[in-house]
Amino acid sequence: MKRCGLLGEKLGHSYSPAIHAELADYDYRLYEVAPEKLGEFLKDGEFDGLNVTIPYKKAVIPYCAALSPIAQKLQSVNVLVRRADGTLYGDNADAYGFDAMVKASGISVEGKKALVLGSGGASATVCAVLNELRARSVTVISRSGEDNYGNLDRHADAEIIVNTTPVGMYPNCGVSPVDLRQFPRLAGVLDIVYNPARTALVMQAETLGIPYMSGLYMLVAQAKRTAEVFEGHAILGSETERIWKKLGREMQNIVLIGMPGSGKSTVAARLAEALDRVALDSDAEIEERNGASCASLIERNGEAAFRALESEVIADLGRRSGMVIATGGGCVTREENYASLHQNGVIFWLRRDLDKLPREGRPLSAGDLGAMYNKRRACYERFADYSVDNNGTVEETLRQIMAVLSEGEK
């Protein structure tokens, strides 16, 4: 079996092994190598093929006996193959990946003015692809160059924006490199960040009705191209779409919202068990962090202080991936919680008749539940992707949710 993997200095969690397992039958592992050990590893390491990531895409070039035309042009290598004579061949699959991402997005860049945010290694690749796709002009925005974030007004006529910076990437979610409202002619936003699934930049594009795409498709497409180089034969293009959808589903959080006592925690636990996922509960997390029940925290400090604690917890839970998350009934009263939950999640509103909602141990439910519901209803509607009736059995509710999730697999 071929020995392949991902080379970098600090890798942490990577989706690459899971993607490559879908593409080919070779061993794919992570290789964390310190800069001072890079040369030794490349000369003597026992590998047949490598992906290369930060900070080594240029550093590996002197160790290559030959480069592909695209790697030579970009002076960036993210694929290494050890040839039969022991020498290294360098290639670049990032350009293929970004090109595939643009085409899958349906966003046309031909004849349009494009801004590329960031001047790092990915920026050069993106610029090359945009030029190949016949963008009218391509301008790099950096922190200190001639075109920078302080004079973006020069480019208010931009029609395409591509983010190549790590701004908004996990774990520092919720921040954006630019405010898209500065660009009234925008026709498309592309963000090569793939974790979270929707960055703050992408969510603003979504809100403004601007076509967009996140970076997961690029990651999968470049992995397909890498596997073709490793294996020496073509792989069906449809595999990119299949794996992209599969990985997207696996990374997606399933979020439950609804009135206090509507069954969110119970359904979350059963759903997590059925899907072999981890169930998280924002109320339970608040209580764990503060050493007191939610009811006592509200009674002691007031609802506003409690909501601030809740938003902190939801921000932490929402940046995780592949979880089932039960939320507190009032989380929808804070708009900031929507972004935290939506960035990685599909949101289900569990609906239960008011006369079936328990009140004991819930200080905010002690009053007029009808008034509370009427006040929150628009918020639940705003947050929810889907609405599920939870007046029957847990099994019936699970079937409704699973039916929605299954439909998304098609």
Where in the sequence are the language-model features?
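NAD(P)-binding Rossmann-fold cofactor-contacting core
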Residues: 132-149, 283-290
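NTP-dependent small-molecule kinase module
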Residues: 241-249, 254, 270, 274, ...
